[in-house]
Amino acid sequence: MRPLTPRQAEILDLIKNNIAETGMPPTRAEIANRLGFKSANAAEEHLKALAKKGFIEIMPGTSRGIRLPQEEQVETGLPLIGQVAAGEPILAQEHVEQYYQVDPNMFKPAADFLLRVRGDSMKNIGILEGDLLAVHKMQQARNGQVVVARVDDDVTVKRFEQKGNVIYLHAENEDYNPIKVDLSCQSLTIEGLAVGVIRNGDWL
């Protein structure tokens, strides 16, 4: 590979760090904003130079269409997320316990990460202790969907219901009461949508 200019090296580091912290590459606009470019087009020119030198691959037609070459991807497959630190992105690299060779596209929509189920609060719909829950990363939810939510930095899997400014996170087990979240005084973040279950990881 041809050597990088200091600016190209800075952009490559930004791309790698963004993928490690959020699981996604940055958009052109995000690169321009963080590095002080006047426009996303300036970032695009640097990305083209990085691609020409073989440090990244550009996938047309998507704002985050940047990929590291396969040899740069130390780990592949779906990441299994372990304990999530308060205030940290759920896909931050330090939260990844290991990677499983699971095709994300076997789930609809495609899975972005796996979460190990703790407890039996969702047992009535077949989500059991020790299962691996496949999750599609998203930040909004509709009533009735099973979501991974972060409430005051606790991560939980529940069925979502919103009534005005109040959100109810329902268990699928009569032994558990709903979690009530008043958005006027509490924080709630939707981390993703449950899209499938791998039973106890037996076949992995």
UniProtKB/Swiss-Prot annotation:
Catalysis: reaction(s): Hydrolysis of Ala-|-Gly bond in repressor LexA
EC class name: hydrolase
Residue ranges the UniProt entry marks as DNA-binding: 28-48
Gene Ontology process terms (BP): DNA repair; DNA replication; negative regulation of DNA-templated transcription; proteolysis; SOS response
KW Ligase (keyword) present: no
Entry's family note: Belongs to the peptidase S24 family.
Record note on quaternary structure: Homodimer.
Function: Represses a number of genes involved in the response to DNA damage (SOS response), including recA and lexA. In the presence of single-stranded DNA, RecA interacts with LexA causing an autocatalytic cleavage which disrupts the DNA-binding part of LexA, leading to derepression of the SOS regulon and eventually DNA repair.
Protein name in the entry: LexA repressor
Organism encoding this protein: Shewanella frigidimarina (strain NCIMB 400)
Organism ancestry: Bacteria, Pseudomonadati, Pseudomonadota, Gammaproteobacteria, Alteromonadales
